[in-house]
Design a protein with these regions (language model features):
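N-terminal secretory signal peptides that target proteins for export/translocation
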Residues: 1-11
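Bacterial N-terminal signal peptides
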Residues: 16-23
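Sec/Tat signal peptide C-region and signal peptidase I cleavage site
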Residues: 26-29
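Carbohydrate-active catalytic/glycan-binding domains of CAZyme proteins
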Residues: 31-463
Length: 463
C-alpha cells in the first residue's frame, strides 16, 4: 500500500474531525473527537496481524571469498558425495577443526555450519528445500573461535565431496528478542531512508542481528551483525540489546545482555555469566550495516542476574532509567535508575508479580508506557516509571496457543507466550498509526534440550 493511501484507514477519524471543524465551524465537536484520540492508551488498540515470516538461512549478506573466518559466521557447502567435511585451517596449515558432513543423509544436499561464539557449532542440512538440524558439534579443547587473530588466520575450506565454502552474515534459522533501534535519549524511532530498524537475536548463529523495514511495505531485510569487544582479545556474540543513537554524546550506545560470558568464568552469575548479566556498549560509527564491533564493559550490577534491558534518559527526573528483567522469584520486570548511562544503577521499583520477558519502554500520545511479554499468555502494559499495572495488548491472532502456525517444518503450535512486545507509534502517512513487532517461540523439531532455536517474526498494525 502506498503511503498516500494511509487516510483510508489510519487517519480516518482524525480526518473526519478536521473536516467537521472546517465545514461546520463546530469546534467543540471536532476538538472532542481529536481529544478522544489523544486520550487513547495501548490497551484501547486492537492489533491486526499484517505479516509473518521465519527466515531459515535465506536472509544473508555474502562475504567475499578472500574473507577467512567470522566468529558469527554462517558457512555453507554443497555436498555431492561422502565422505565430506568443512575444515578450519590456519594459514600455516594447522587444522583447528573438522566438521564432518552427515552420513545419515543421502547427497546431494547443502550442509550449514553456524557458529555461536564459545559454544557448540550447529550443523544443519538443507535437502529438498527443507532445513533441519542434524547435530551439535562440540568445539575442540583449547579452540575458541572468538579470538580476534582467527579472523585473519583461519581459512574455511571444503574437503572430500564438499564444494567451496561460502561465508555470510546470516539472520540464521530463527529470529527472536526483537527491539526497535531508537534515536536520541528519549526512545523515539530511528529512521534511515524511510526505514525503521530493529535488533534481534540470530538463532543458531548466536549473534546480535540488525534488520529494517519500510512500515508501508513490510519488506523486512537483514542489514548487519554486531559483535562486542570487551578488550580481552575476543569478538563476542552477545544478544538481547537496546541499541540507540545518542546524538548528544556523539556516539551509538547499547544496553546488552552478556550471554557470551556463559562458561567463561568471568563471574558467579547464572550459568557462569558475568555478574549482573548486563553490559554497556558504544561506538562512533553507525553499527547498523554489515559487520560492526562495539566496545563493551560490565554495567556493574551487583548480586542478582538481569536481562532484556531497555534504557532511556528522563529529562524531568534527570536520571537514566533502565527497564529490565530481574532473576528473583523467577524472572520479573523491574525499573532501575542512575545518574550516568553506564551506571551504577539502583532499584527505583520492586519487581512486578508476573513472569516477564522483553521489557520495553515506548511512547504513545506523548506518554511513556512499559511493555513486557509473559508466560501468562499476555503482553502486559504498565505505567512508567513506577510500574503500576494498566492492562494488556489485544492481538487478533496471538503467536501462541491454539492458533496453528505455518513453519518450514509443517504446521505447528506452541503454548509458550514469552515473546517480546516491540511497540512503536508511527508518524502520519502510514497505513497504521501503531505497529507491533514480535516473535513466536517455536523450536526446530528434533533439537536437543535445552535449546534456543525459536523465532518467527510477526508484524501487527493498529489505528
Amino acid at each position: 500500500m502506498r503511503r498516500f493511501e494511509a487516510t483510508k484507514n489510519s487517519g480516518l477519524r482524525m480526518l473526519c474531525a478536521c473536516l467537521l471543524l472546517f465545514m461546520t465551524g463546530n469546534r467543540t465537536m471536532a476538538e472532542e473527537q481529536m481529544d478522544d484520540l489523544k486520550k487513547r492508551t495501548p490497551m484501547d488498540l486492537s492489533f491486526k496481524q499484517l505479516w509473518k515470516r521465519r527466515f531459515v538461512f535465506d536472509a544473508e549478506i555474502p562475504f567475499p571469498k578472500d574473507v577467512t573466518f567470522l566468529p558469527c559466521g554462517h558457512f555453507a557447502a554443497d555436498v555431492t558425495s561422502l565422505p565430506a567435511e568443512i575444515q578450519l585451517v590456519t594459514k600455516s596449515g594447522d587444522v583447528k577443526m573438522c566438521i564432518e558432513a552427515p552420513v545419515d543423509v543421502q547427497p546431494p544436499y547443502t550442509m550449514h555450519a553456524a557458529f555461536g561464539g564459545k559454544a557448540r557449532v550447529g550443523l544443519f542440512v538443507t535437502k529438498d528445500g527443507v532445513t533441519r538440524l542434524n547435530k551439535l558439534v562440540p568445539l575442540p579443547d583449547g579452540f575458541d573461535p572468538r579470538e580476534k587473530s582467527y579472523t585473519t588466520d583461519l581459512v574455511m575450506r571444503g574437503a572430500g565431496g564438499a564444494g567451496d565454502v561460502k561465508c555470510s552474515l546470516s539472520a540464521g534459522m530463527g529470529q527472536a528478542d526483537v527491539r526497535f533501534v531508537t534515536r536520541g535519549r528519549e526512545n523515539t524511532l530511528y529512521w534511515e531512508d524511510g526505514r525503521i530498524f530493529f535488533t534481534f537475536s540470530v538463532r543458531a548463529c548466536g549473534a546480535e542481528g540488525v534488520a529494517s523495514f519500510d512500515p508501508a511495505k513490510l519488506d523486512v531485510r537483514l542489514e548487519g551483525i554486531i559483535l562486542f569487544d570487551y578488550g580481552d582479545g575476543k569478538l563476542r556474540n552477545d544478544v538481547a540489546c537496546h541499541l540507540f543513537h545518542d546524538e548528544e554524546a556523539g556516539e551509538w550506545r547499547a544496553f546488552v545482555s552478556n550471554f557470551s560470558t556463559g562458561g567463561d568464568g568471568l563471574g558467579n552469575g547464572l550459568n557462569g555469566r558475568a555478574e549482573g548479566g548486563l553490559n554497556s556498549a558504544w561506538c562512533k560509527e553507525n553499527p547498523l550495516h554489515g559487520l560492526s564491533v562495539m566496545k563493551a564493559k560490565s554495567l556493574g550490577l551487583k548480586g542478582l542476574m538481569h536481562e532484556d534491558p531497555s534504557g532511556i534518559w528522563d529529562p524531568e527526573a534527570k536520571k537514566w532509567r533502565l527497564f529490565l528483567c530481574t532473576f528473583v522469584k523467577g524472572i520479573k520486570a523491574q525499573m532501575l535508575e542512575s545518574d550516568n548511562w553506564d551506571g551504577p544503577y539502583e532499584p527505583l521499583t520492586e519487581i512486578v508479580p508476573e513472569d516477564s520477558t522483553g521489557t520495553t519502554i515506548q511512547w504513545m500520545n506523548g506518554v511513556r508506557y512499559c511493555f513486557f511479554g509473559s508466560a501468562e499468555h499476555a503482553l502486559y502494559v504498565y505505567s512508567y516509571p513506577l510500574l503500576k499495572k494498566l492492562g494488556k495488548l489485544k492481538l487478533d491472532v496471538e503467536p501462541w496457543g491454539d492458533t496453528p502456525l505455518e513453519t518450514p517444518w509443517g504446521v505447528m503450535k506452541t503454548t509458550n507466550s514469552r515473546v517480546w512486545p516491540c511497540f512503536a507509534e508511527l508518524p502520519d502517512g502510514y497505513p497504521y498509526k501503531y505497529i507491533l513487532l514480535t516473535m513466536d517461540r517455536i523450536n526446530i523439531p528434533g533439537m536437543p534440550n535445552p535449546n534456543w532455536t525459536y523465532g518467527g517474526l510477526y508484524i501487527y498494525g493498529a489505528n
